[in-house]
C-alpha cells in the first residue's frame, strides 16, 4: 500500500494531516474520548493494558485487524490467546502476498485478512490479486475490506475506483464461499454496499466506529436507519458488530457498543437477533464457536 508521503510528498502529506485534525478533535469531543497518548509502551505493556481494559468493561475477547505486521501481531495474540485474535494485514499486490497469507494463518495463527481498499496502488479487482482471494477461500478465512472515506473529514483517498464497494462485485461473485466483510456500513457508500450484498450473498456488513460519515450524506441518515435497512435486506446473519478501537487511554470503545445496542433494542428486535449481531456472527467468522 502506498503511503501518503510516498504518493503526495512529505509537505502535502503534512497538510492533509493538519486539515483532518479539526474533524478528529470534534469527533473525540462528541464521544467524550481523550486525546491519544504520545508516550511509547512496549507490546507486552500494551497487551496487559488491553486485558485490564477488557476486564474493566466486561468484554470477553477482541480481534485486532492490524498490529505492526503479521509477525508482531501474532506475537501479541499469543500473549493472551484466550482474549485476543488477529488478522493478517499486508500488501495485496506483493509478489508473495498469497504465500504470506497462508503463512500468517497456518503458521502464525491469524484468522483473517484486512485491507484498506482506497489505499491500494492498483484496483482491487485487478486479476493479479486473484491468487490471494483463492488462498483466502482455501483457508476459509474472512476478508475485511475498508471501502469509502478514510479517517475523519479531510482524509484523502488514493484510489477513487477503490472507494466504491461495487468494485468488489466481480471478485465476490468469483469466490462465492469466501466471506467478505465491509466495515462502517460502507463509509458513505451504503447504497452501493447494499447493491453488492444483493448480488453477492457472501458479503457481510460491519457496524464499526462512530459512523460520522452519516453527517456528510446529502440526506438525513441515522444509525437506526442503517440497522433497520440492513435487517430488512440482508438480515441479522450478515451483520457484524465492531468498534474500530485502537489507542489508549480510550481503549475499547464501549460508547459505540452502548449506542449500537440501544439503537438495535429500540427497533424491537428479538434477543437472538441481538446476540447474532453483537457476538455470534463474529464468533462464527473467527471459528470461536464451540
Task: Tell where the protein language model's regions lie, with residue ranges.
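Generic structural signal for well-ordered alpha-helices
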Residues: 48-51, 70-77, 101-102, 129, ...
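Conserved, mostly hydrophobic/aromatic
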Residues: 54, 73, 104, 113, ...
Amino acid at each position: 500500500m502506498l503511503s501518503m508521503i510516498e504518493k503526495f510528498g512529505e509537505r502535502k502529506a503534512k497538510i492533509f494531516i493538519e486539515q483532518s485534525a479539526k474533524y478528529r478533535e470534534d469527533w473525540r469531543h462528541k464521544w467524550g474520548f481523550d486525546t491519544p497518548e504520545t508516550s511509547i509502551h512496549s507490546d507486552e505493556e500494551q497487551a496487559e493494558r488491553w486485558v485490564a481494559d477488557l476486564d474493566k468493561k466486561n468484554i470477553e475477547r477482541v480481534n485486532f485487524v492490524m498490529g505492526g505486521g503479521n509477525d508482531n501481531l501474532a506475537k501479541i495474540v499469543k500473549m493472551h490467546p484466550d482474549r485476543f485474535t488477529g488478522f493478517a494485514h499486508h500488501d495485496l499486490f506483493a509478489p508473495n502476498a498469497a504465500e504470506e497469507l497462508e503463512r500468517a494463518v497456518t503458521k502464525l495463527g491469524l484468522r483473517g485478512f484486512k485491507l484498506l481498499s482506497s489505499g491500494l496502488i492498483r484496483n482491487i479487482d485487478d486479476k493479479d490479486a486473484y491468487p490471494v482471494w483463492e488462498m483466502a477461500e482455501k483457508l476459509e478465512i474472512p476478508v475485511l475490506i475498508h471501502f469509502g472515506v478514510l479517517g475523519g473529514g479531510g482524509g484523502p483517498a488514493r484510489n477513487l475506483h477503490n472507494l466504491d464497494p461495487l468494485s468488489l462485485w466481480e471478485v465476490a461473485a468469483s469466490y462465492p464461499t469466501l466471506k467478505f466483510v465491509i466495515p462502517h456500513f460502507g463509509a458513505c457508500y451504503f447504497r452501493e454496499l447494499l447493491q453488492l450484498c444483493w448480488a453477492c450473498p457472501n458479503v457481510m456488513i460491519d457496524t464499526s466506529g462512530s459512523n460520522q460519515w452519516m453527517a456528510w450524506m446529502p440526506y438525513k441518515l441515522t444509525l437506526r436507519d442503517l440497522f433497520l435497512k440492513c435487517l430488512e435486506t440482508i438480515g441479522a446473519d450478515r451483520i457484524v458488530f465492531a468498534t474500530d478501537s485502537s489507542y489508549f487511554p480510550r481503549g475499547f470503545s464501549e460508547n459505540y457498543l452502548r449506542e449500537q445496542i440501544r439503537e438495535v433494542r429500540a427497533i424491537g428486535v428479538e434477543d437472538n437477533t441481538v446476540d447474532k449481531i453483537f457476538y455470534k456472527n463474529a464468533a462464527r467468522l473467527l471459528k470461536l464457536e464451540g
